[in-house]
Protein backbone atom coordinates (compact mmCIF):
# COMPACT_ATOMS: atom_id res chain seq x y z
CA UNK A 1 0.00 0.00 0.00
CA UNK A 2 1.06 3.58 -0.63
CA UNK A 3 1.84 5.74 2.39
CA UNK A 4 -0.88 8.32 2.99
CA UNK A 5 0.08 11.99 2.99
CA UNK A 6 -0.41 12.58 6.71
CA UNK A 7 2.13 9.86 7.51
CA UNK A 8 4.72 11.69 5.39
CA UNK A 9 4.79 14.63 7.82
CA UNK A 10 7.73 14.38 10.23
CA UNK A 11 5.86 14.37 13.53
CA UNK A 12 9.14 14.78 15.46
CA UNK A 13 9.34 18.32 14.02
CA UNK A 14 5.64 19.15 14.14
CA UNK A 15 4.58 21.99 16.43
CA UNK A 16 1.14 22.92 17.65
CA UNK A 17 -0.67 25.08 15.12
CA UNK A 18 -3.06 25.26 12.18
CA UNK A 19 -1.97 23.42 9.04
CA UNK A 20 -3.45 22.59 5.66
CA UNK A 21 -3.39 18.81 5.73
CA UNK A 22 -4.74 18.37 2.20
CA UNK A 23 -6.83 19.90 -0.56
CA UNK A 24 -9.17 17.78 -2.63
CA UNK A 25 -11.32 18.48 -5.63
CA UNK A 26 -14.60 16.61 -5.62
CA UNK A 27 -16.41 17.32 -8.86
CA UNK A 28 -16.47 21.10 -9.18
CA UNK A 29 -15.97 21.65 -5.44
CA UNK A 30 -12.76 22.16 -3.48
CA UNK A 31 -12.38 20.80 0.05
CA UNK A 32 -9.61 21.93 2.40
CA UNK A 33 -8.70 19.72 5.35
CA UNK A 34 -7.08 21.52 8.27
CA UNK A 35 -4.92 19.91 10.94
CA UNK A 36 -5.64 21.81 14.16
CA UNK A 37 -2.71 20.50 16.18
CA UNK A 38 -3.50 21.12 19.85
CA UNK A 39 -0.74 18.92 21.32
CA UNK A 40 2.88 18.49 20.26
CA UNK A 41 3.10 14.93 18.95
CA UNK A 42 5.03 12.47 21.10
CA UNK A 43 6.32 15.26 23.41
CA UNK A 44 3.13 16.16 25.21
CA UNK A 45 0.34 14.04 26.65
CA UNK A 46 -2.49 13.51 24.18
CA UNK A 47 -5.90 15.02 24.75
CA UNK A 48 -8.07 13.24 27.27
CA UNK A 49 -10.79 11.44 25.30
CA UNK A 50 -13.62 13.02 27.31
CA UNK A 51 -12.16 16.51 26.80
CA UNK A 52 -11.72 15.86 23.06
CA UNK A 53 -15.29 14.55 22.79
CA UNK A 54 -16.62 17.62 24.59
CA UNK A 55 -14.60 19.94 22.34
CA UNK A 56 -15.97 18.07 19.33
CA UNK A 57 -19.57 18.75 20.42
CA UNK A 58 -18.94 22.39 21.30
CA UNK A 59 -16.77 22.96 18.23
CA UNK A 60 -19.07 21.34 15.69
CA UNK A 61 -22.05 23.26 17.05
CA UNK A 62 -20.16 26.58 17.07
CA UNK A 63 -18.78 26.09 13.57
CA UNK A 64 -22.05 24.99 11.96
CA UNK A 65 -23.74 28.06 13.44
CA UNK A 66 -20.99 30.50 12.45
CA UNK A 67 -22.34 33.44 10.43
CA UNK A 68 -19.53 33.42 7.83
CA UNK A 69 -18.35 29.80 7.72
CA UNK A 70 -21.39 27.81 8.86
CA UNK A 71 -22.45 26.80 5.35
CA UNK A 72 -18.86 25.80 4.47
CA UNK A 73 -18.33 23.37 7.35
CA UNK A 74 -18.12 19.76 6.21
CA UNK A 75 -16.67 18.13 9.32
CA UNK A 76 -15.00 18.89 12.64
CA UNK A 77 -13.72 16.13 14.90
CA UNK A 78 -10.77 14.70 16.81
CA UNK A 79 -7.79 12.91 15.31
CA UNK A 80 -7.45 9.28 16.27
CA UNK A 81 -4.11 10.04 17.96
CA UNK A 82 -5.86 12.68 20.10
CA UNK A 83 -3.27 15.37 19.40
CA UNK A 84 -5.74 17.64 17.65
CA UNK A 85 -8.74 18.00 15.38
CA UNK A 86 -9.54 17.91 11.70
CA UNK A 87 -11.65 20.65 10.16
CA UNK A 88 -12.92 20.19 6.62
CA UNK A 89 -14.16 23.27 4.78
CA UNK A 90 -15.82 23.60 1.41
CA UNK A 91 -13.47 25.86 -0.57
CA UNK A 92 -9.79 26.39 -1.19
CA UNK A 93 -8.06 27.96 1.81
CA UNK A 94 -4.64 28.51 3.34
CA UNK A 95 -3.94 28.25 7.06
CA UNK A 96 -3.74 32.01 7.48
CA UNK A 97 -7.27 32.34 6.06
CA UNK A 98 -8.85 30.59 9.04
CA UNK A 99 -6.77 31.89 11.97
CA UNK A 100 -9.52 34.25 13.11
CA UNK A 101 -12.14 31.49 12.86
CA UNK A 102 -10.02 29.07 14.90
CA UNK A 103 -9.33 31.77 17.49
CA UNK A 104 -13.07 32.41 17.78
CA UNK A 105 -13.75 28.69 18.11
CA UNK A 106 -11.25 28.02 20.89
CA UNK A 107 -12.10 31.25 22.75
CA UNK A 108 -15.76 30.21 22.63
CA UNK A 109 -14.88 26.74 23.93
CA UNK A 110 -12.63 28.13 26.68
CA UNK A 111 -15.43 30.41 27.89
CA UNK A 112 -18.30 27.96 27.36
CA UNK A 113 -20.93 27.76 30.10
CA UNK A 114 -24.03 25.62 30.27
CA UNK A 115 -25.01 22.25 28.93
CA UNK A 116 -22.74 20.69 26.31
CA UNK A 117 -24.66 20.58 23.01
CA UNK A 118 -25.81 17.09 22.07
CA UNK A 119 -24.79 15.54 25.40
CA UNK A 120 -27.77 13.27 25.91
CA UNK A 121 -28.48 9.60 25.27
CA UNK A 122 -30.89 10.57 22.47
CA UNK A 123 -28.34 12.78 20.67
CA UNK A 124 -25.00 10.99 21.19
CA UNK A 125 -23.75 7.42 21.21
CA UNK A 126 -21.43 7.97 24.18
CA UNK A 127 -22.91 10.98 25.94
CA UNK A 128 -21.31 10.21 29.32
CA UNK A 129 -17.81 10.61 27.85
CA UNK A 130 -17.72 14.35 28.53
CA UNK A 131 -15.51 16.61 30.64
CA UNK A 132 -16.40 20.27 30.20
CA UNK A 133 -13.91 21.54 32.76
CA UNK A 134 -10.96 19.80 31.10
CA UNK A 135 -12.20 20.77 27.62
CA UNK A 136 -12.25 24.42 28.66
CA UNK A 137 -8.73 24.10 30.11
CA UNK A 138 -7.40 22.56 26.89
CA UNK A 139 -9.13 25.19 24.73
CA UNK A 140 -7.75 28.04 26.85
CA UNK A 141 -4.23 26.59 26.72
CA UNK A 142 -4.28 26.21 22.92
CA UNK A 143 -5.65 29.72 22.55
CA UNK A 144 -3.13 31.37 24.88
CA UNK A 145 -0.02 29.38 23.94
CA UNK A 146 -0.55 28.93 20.20
CA UNK A 147 -3.39 30.89 18.61
CA UNK A 148 -2.96 34.26 20.31
CA UNK A 149 0.48 34.92 18.80
CA UNK A 150 0.55 32.38 15.98
CA UNK A 151 3.48 32.60 13.55
CA UNK A 152 4.57 30.99 10.29
CA UNK A 153 6.14 28.01 12.09
CA UNK A 154 2.68 27.18 13.36
CA UNK A 155 0.95 27.62 9.99
CA UNK A 156 3.15 25.57 7.66
CA UNK A 157 4.16 21.93 8.02
CA UNK A 158 7.88 21.39 8.73
CA UNK A 159 10.05 20.56 5.72
Curated annotation (Swiss-Prot):
Q: Which UniProt keywords apply?
A: Autoinducer synthesis, Iron, Lyase, Metal-binding, Quorum sensing
The domain of life for this entry's organism is Bacteria
What Pfam families is this protein classified in? LuxS
Enzyme Commission numbers on file: 4.4.1.21
Q: What chemistry does it catalyse, as a reaction equation?
A: S-(5-deoxy-D-ribos-5-yl)-L-homocysteine = (S)-4,5-dihydroxypentane-2,3-dione + L-homocysteine
Q: Which SUPFAM superfamilies match?
A: LuxS/MPP-like metallohydrolase
Molecular function via GO: iron ion binding; S-ribosylhomocysteine lyase activity
Which cofactors does the annotated protein need, by name?
Fe cation
**GO process annotations (BP):** quorum sensing
Q: Which Gene3D superfamilies match?
A: S-ribosylhomocysteinase (LuxS) (3.30.1360.80)
Residues where Fe cation binds: 53, 57, 124
Free-text comment on the cofactor? Binds 1 Fe cation per subunit.
PANTHER family, alphabetically?
S-RIBOSYLHOMOCYSTEINE LYASE (PTHR35799:SF1)
Q: Which family does it belong to?
A: Belongs to the LuxS family.
- Function in brief: Involved in the synthesis of autoinducer 2 (AI-2) which is secreted by bacteria and is used to communicate both the cell density and the metabolic potential of the environment. The regulation of gene expression in response to changes in cell density is called quorum sensing. Catalyzes the transformation of S-ribosylhomocysteine (RHC) to homocysteine (HC) and 4,5-dihydroxy-2,3-pentadione (DPD).
Assembly mode? Homodimer.
Q: What is the name of this protein? A: S-ribosylhomocysteine lyase
Which organism is this entry from?
Maridesulfovibrio salexigens (strain ATCC 14822 / DSM 2638 / NCIMB 8403 / VKM B-1763)
Amino acid sequence: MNKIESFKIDHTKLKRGIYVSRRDQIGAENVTTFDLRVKEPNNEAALDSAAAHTLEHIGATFLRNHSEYGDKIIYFGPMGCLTGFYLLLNGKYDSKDVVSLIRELFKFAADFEGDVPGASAVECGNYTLMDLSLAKTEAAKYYAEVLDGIGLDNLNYPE
